[in-house]
Swiss-Prot record:
Family, similarity comment: Belongs to the NadD family.
Pathway: Cofactor biosynthesis; NAD(+) biosynthesis; deamido-NAD(+) from nicotinate D-ribonucleotide: step 1/1
Known function: Catalyzes the reversible adenylation of nicotinate mononucleotide (NaMN) to nicotinic acid adenine dinucleotide (NaAD).
Alphabetized InterPro entries for the sequence: Cyt_trans-like, NadD/NMNAT, Rossmann-like_a/b/a_fold
Enzyme class: transferase
NCBIfam families: nicotinate (nicotinamide) nucleotide adenylyltransferase
Annotated coiled-coil segments of the chain: none
Catalytic activity, reaction form: nicotinate beta-D-ribonucleotide + ATP + H(+) = deamido-NAD(+) + diphosphate
Disulfide bridge positions per record: none
Protein name per the record: Probable nicotinate-nucleotide adenylyltransferase
Amino acid sequence: MVLVYGGSFNPPTIAHEAIIHKLHEEFKPKKILIVPTGNYFSWKTDLIDFEHRFKMVELMTQHLDYVEISRLENTKAFLGSYHTLNELSKRYDDLYFVVGADHIKTLDQWKDYKKLIENYKFILLTRNNYTFDDDLLSKLGLKYEKMMFQSDISSSEIRKNLNQNLDKLNLNVKTYILENKLYEEVKV
């Protein structure tokens, strides 16, 4: 089993770190692949450059030998999760796509979502007792497992008020953000 955990990681928080640890603890995968999204989201005006986000994830996970960070989505064009998983499946067997359960309600709007559902298994992350729409999951035909976690930490809240939220960041990530003066001009 290899888990693929994608996200903007803008910035990666201690909640992301806790999720990685819990995924490893609960599912015992051979590897967890972290896939930061590329810079192609024109509607995400506060998304800092891929290289900074990649480096922060690297700093946060450097002590975890079961984590690998992928540059696969560092492209100029949006290709979609199916394309990413398809490319990764050329190197890894038994892929599971880790996704927040709240994203499932819009899954039918994703690029190549039917192929994604047909070809890959999911691990649905549920935060703070999120209620699943079992009818929707059944209708989609999703092959999935669930993992619950408790957290109120939000990357967007950290970006809005960095100084008040530094305690929600891994020490290495915090140092990197301060040294590189990231998120100083973010106005969300």
